[in-house]
C-alpha cells in the first residue's frame, strides 16, 4: 500500500510513499540495537559532530524544508521557517553543546556517615531504542527535537510521522542521512499510528514518545502498561494569556491574535483563554 501526502491548500498530491511492512519490525529492531551499541560507545563530543552535520544541512536547505512543510501541512512559509525549521537548527546547536553537561556523570556527596568512605556517582545510561509517533501540526520540529535528544543520549530512533505528512518524514530522513549515522540507528516508518505502536510494543521498544490526541494517548498508555514500557505523552493544552493593566495593549492584542490563530489554531501552546485586568479590559477587547 501507499500513503499519499495531500496539500490541504490545493488538494494536489505532494508525495506518495510506500507503507512500511511491519512484518519486518523484528529485523528493524535488531538493526537498531546493533547500531545503538556502536553509537552508545561514542563520546558526547563524537555524537555532537554528527549532529553538527545535520545542523549545517538544515541551515543550507532552510527554504526547501520550509516549502516541504508548507506544502504537506498547509501552514505559511514564514510560519514553517519560524516554528519548524529554525527550532530544528537551534535544537542541534543546543543539544550538541550541552548534552554532555546535562547527561555526563555527576558526583554526589555521601548522604550518611556510614557512606563517608564511599564514592557516589550518578550516570545516565541510554535507554536503547526509542520510538516516536509524531503529529501533523508540527511535523518537523516536534519529532526532530525528540530525535536529537534521543541521539545525543546514545539511543537509536524509530520514527513514525503523522499519516497526513509523510513527505516531511522523508525530509527528516534526508537530514539524518546528512548526519552520517551508523546504518540502522535511525529508521523512518510509514503507516498507521495504531498499527506501528502495536509493532513497537510487541518488539520491545524501550521508550515511546507520542504527541497527539487524548483518546490515542490513553490507548497507548494502556498498551505500554502491559510491558511496563516508559511513555512520554503530549496530548494538547488549554493555554491562558494574562494581560495586566500596565501592558502595551497594541503588542498584547497582536500577540493574542497571532497566538490564537497561528497554524489555524492547531497548536498545543496556542492561546485559548485570555484573562484581562478590569482596568484595561474594554480597551483590550476593542483593539482585539
Features from the language model and the residues they span:
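Short beta->alpha connector loops at strand-helix junctions that form conserved
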Residues: 155, 160-162, 190, 211-212, ...
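Residue-level signal for inorganic ion chemistry
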Residues: 11, 47, 92, 154, ...
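Periplasmic-binding protein-like
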Residues: 148, 207-211
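N-terminal Rossmann-like NAD(P)+-binding subdomain of aldehyde/semialdehyde dehydrogenases
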Residues: 1-118
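A structured beta-alpha segment of the ubiquitous adenosine-cofactor-binding alpha/beta core
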Residues: 119-120, 187-206
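ALDH superfamily catalytic-core signature
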Residues: 207, 215-288
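Conserved small-residue-rich beta-alpha loop and adjacent elements
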Residues: 106-183, 228, 250
Amino acid at each position: 500500500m501507499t500513503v499519499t501526502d495531500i496539500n490541504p491548500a490545493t488538494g494536489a498530491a505532494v508525495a506518495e510513499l510506500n507503507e512500511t511492512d511491519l512484518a519486518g519490525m523484528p529485523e528493524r529492531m535488531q538493526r537498531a540495537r546493533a547500531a545503538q551499541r556502536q553509537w552508545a560507545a561514542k563520546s558526547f563530543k563524537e555524537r555532537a559532530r554528527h549532529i553538527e552535520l545535520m545542523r549545517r544541512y538544515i541551515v543550507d536547505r532552510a527554504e526547501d524544508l520550509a516549502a516541504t512543510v508548507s506544502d504537506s501541512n498547509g501552514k505559511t512559509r514564514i510560519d514553517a521557517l519560524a516554528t519548524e525549521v529554525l527550532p530544528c537548527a537551534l535544537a542541534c546547536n543546543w543539544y550538541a553543546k550541552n548534552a554532555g553537561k546535562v547527561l555526563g556523570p555527576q558526583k554526589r556527596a555521601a548522604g550518611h556517615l556510614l557512606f563517608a568512605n564511599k564514592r557516589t556517582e550518578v550516570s545516565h545510561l541510554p535507554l536503547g531504542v526509542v520510538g516516536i509517533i509524531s503529529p501533523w501540526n508540527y511535523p518537523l520540529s516536534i519529532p526532530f527535537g525528540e530525535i536529537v535528544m534521543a541521539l545525543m543520549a546514545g539511543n537509536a530512533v524509530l520514527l513514525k510521522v503523522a499519516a497526513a505528512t509523510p513527505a516531511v518524514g522523508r525530509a527528516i530522513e534526508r537530514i539524518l542521512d546528512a548526519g552520517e549515522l551508523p546504518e540502522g540507528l535511525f529508521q523512518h516508518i510509514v503507516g498507521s499510528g495504531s498499527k506501528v505502536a502495536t509493532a513497537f510494543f510487541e518488539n520491545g521498544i524501550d521508550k515511546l514518545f507520542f504527541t497527539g490526541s487524548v483518546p490515542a494517548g490513553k490507548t497507548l498508555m494502556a498498551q505500554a502498561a502491559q510491558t511496563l514500557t516508559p511513555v512520554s505523552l503530549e496530548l494538547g493544552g488549554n493555554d491562558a494569556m494574562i494581560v495586566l493593566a500596565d501592558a502595551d495593549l497594541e503588542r498584547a492584542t497582536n500577540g493574542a491574535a497571532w497566538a490564537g490563530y497561528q497554524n489555524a489554531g492547531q497548536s498545543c501552546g496556542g492561546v485559548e483563554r485570555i484573562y484581562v485586568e478590569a482596568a484595561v479590559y474594554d480597551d483590550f477587547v476593542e483593539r482585539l
